[in-house]
Amino acid sequence: MKVKFYGVRGSLPTCGPEYQRYGGNTTCLLITREKANRVAIIDAGTGIRKLGKELLTDQFKQEIINILFTHFHADHIQGFPFFAPAYNKQQKIGILVMGKERKMKNIKEIFATQMQSEYFPVQLDSMGAQFDFLSFGDTQTFYGARVTAIAQQHIFPGGSYGLRIEDESGVIVICTDIEHINGVDENIIKFAENADLLIHDGQYTETEYLKYKGWGHSTCNQAIEVAKRANVKKLIITHHDPDHDDDFLENMEEKCKKEFPNCTFAKEGMEVVVR
C-alpha cells in the first residue's frame, strides 16, 4: 500500500510563504493498492481539489471512486464541492462511513447542506456524478483490504472514527481528530498495535492543549506515547494547527524525533509505501 498526503492541516486552510514546506490544505489522503489497481480517499478537506484533478488523468482513472470519512467537521469535507470527478456524469462515487455505534444525520443531507444555494452556486444533486451514500459497521473488506473502524474520544455529534487498513503488504492506522482525555486511550493503543504506519493527530503542544482541552485533538507527545506503547514501526504526525508555520513545525518535528526516531511530520505531497 501507498499513502500520499494531499492535505495535512487542521481546522482551516492556511496560505503564505511561511506555510510552503509543510502545506496549508486541510485533511485529505490517498491510499493506493497497486496490486488491486484501486485507490481510496480518506476525507475531503481542501487537499482533495488537487487530487481530483489528478484522478481525471488516465493514470488514476477509476470506475468507482470511494471516499471514506473519519467524520464530518468542516475541515474534512470543505474541499468536496471542488472535487472535479464529482462533476462527471459517467463517474461513480461512493461516500462511505464506518462505525456501528455512529449516531449522525443522513449522510447525503450533510453534503447537501454545505452546498445549499446560500453557500455555494452548485447544489449536490446538480453536480452530475452518480453518488452512493453508504454506511458500514466496524469491519468491512474493500477490494481485498480489510478496514476496521474504532470510535475515538471526540465529543461532538457523529463522533470521529479511527481506521485500521490491512492487506498483504502491511497495516496502516489513521487516528485524526482524536482527543486523549485523562490519559492516552488504551483502546487506541490496542487498535494500533504492531502497525507498520500510524498517522496520528498532533495539533497541539502540551501548553496549547491546556487552552484547547475539549476541542477534540491531541498533542504530539500523546501521539508518540501511542506509537511507543503500540509498537508501531513508523509514526506520522498530522492535522497541523493553522498557527504553526514551517519553522515552528520543523522545530517540533526535531523534538519528536528525539523521543521516537522513526517519526516525521506530514507534508503535502509526501508519499509513504508500506511493504
Regions found by a protein language model. Name each.
Residues F72-A74, F120, Q152, I178, ...:
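Long, contiguous hydrophobic alpha-helical segments, chiefly transmembrane helices and signal peptides
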Residues M1-I172, I189, E250-V274:
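Binuclear metal-dependent hydrolase catalytic cores
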Residues V171, E179-E268:
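Cap/insert and terminal regions of metallo-dependent hydrolase folds
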